């Protein structure tokens, strides 16, 4: 049996049951205690105590008895109304199912296009998966045909515009050449004075080089002779020093004659050398070019005639030759 107040097995029902069990245990203990008292006391006193104890037990159990009677009544009412309650639950369930059906119908009506689209999409995907090889083949075939047609059209366009393209290329080439010619002419006009000046300088250098080569060829023997004369002059100076030292020794020893002096002997030797040298020389020619140095001047040496004259002047007197 369920709880008379809380009929669903709630925590309140458990507490009441525990309370009833506690009261029953107390009544049992009291009855046991009363039984022991009956054994020990007189019957009148025992009846009095028993009556008082029963009244106390009735007072304590009256609410429990009332609840028990109320529970029995409720159980009877539940039994009477069970069919009505069941019918009510069934009607509620039917009404709920009807409302749920209406809501589901509304949802179906709302989602029907989506469902249809989804089903169509699935069917189309299946069709695509089935026809994909054929579609690819057709696409490739169309691409090949399109490329062939496009190639033909491009070739036709190239054939039509070939002359125009060639003419445009030739025109661009001519324009480029004209622009290049203008630039080159401008460069030539800008650099013409410098080029002419450079040519004149090159010609002047060439003519000067030829003249210098001619002068070098003309003066080469004289330059060689001047070198020989310089070498002879050095040798003559060395010989003069040797003769001077020898004459000094002879004079110191008194071996020289009274009629001969170191100066006269040396004059004879030098005169012979100078006469021989002057016989083989010629007068220096005049300068043909104004401002052009002679080879001897370029070599840093005096002219041959000047060299011989200086040698003769140095040995002209005995005192000069002997260093007196």
From Swiss-Prot:
Does NAD count among this protein's keywords? no
According to its UniProt entry, the protein's GO biological process terms are:
biological process involved in interaction with host
Q: Where in the cell is it found?
A: Secreted
The leader peptide range reads 1-32
Q: Which GO terms describe its cellular component?
A: symbiont-containing vacuole
Q: Which GO terms describe its molecular function?
A: actin filament binding
Coarsely, its chief localization is secreted
Q: Does the keyword Coiled coil apply?
A: yes
UniProt keywords (A-Z) are: Coiled coil, Secreted, Signal
Residues in coiled coil: 195-255
Function per UniProt: Associates with actin filament appendages that are formed in the inclusion appendages of the parasitophorous vacuole during infection of the host erythrocyte.
Protein name (record): Appendage-associated protein
Gene name in the database record = aaaP1
